[in-house]
């Protein structure tokens, strides 16, 4: 079964995760990550690398670019993950495992959307069965607002 088949079975009226192929906007985890970066003033004129190319971060890269960040998207086929992550202001790891060399220094903000980066000062957002703390908080907020409107 593929993603399109599963997501097409979800009724749009009941969908709060914005994880439907016809849903406009970003996924919950992307929205929460963007909100964190905006709150910390880490978007405008910053160098950001996203490691991962999944559905959850595709729109995040677009919105970061619209916020005047320079965005690099790296993935398993990137020739030099080390070079792609070197000397960045923010590195977002949106992949369950890191299998290649990575680089970060003390000025980097590392956001690990899994639990795969050995950075001592990272914002770690571990997830169980693909659901992390950022996603849960945004989903609960959306559900509460939706219930309040009905």
Language-model-derived ranges and their functions:
Residues 55, 115, 131-133:
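Gly/Ser/Thr-rich helix-start
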Residues 6, 11-12, 114-122:
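Acidic-glycine-rich active-site phosphate/pyrophosphate-binding loop
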Residues 1, 28-32, 86, 131-141:
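Conserved active-site and cofactor/substrate-binding residues in soluble primary-metabolism enzymes
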Residues 1, 96-98, 116-117, 134:
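Short glycine-rich anion-binding loops that position phosphate/pyrophosphate groups of nucleotides
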Residues 1-27:
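Phosphate/diphosphate ligand-binding glycine-rich loop within oxidoreductases
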Residues 17-21, 26, 73-74, 112, ...:
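General beta-strand structural signal in soluble alpha/beta enzymes
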Residues 121-150:
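Adenosine-phosphate binding glycine-rich loop
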Residues 25-100, 105-109, 118-122:
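Glycine-rich phosphate/diphosphate-binding loop of Rossmann-like nucleotide-binding domains
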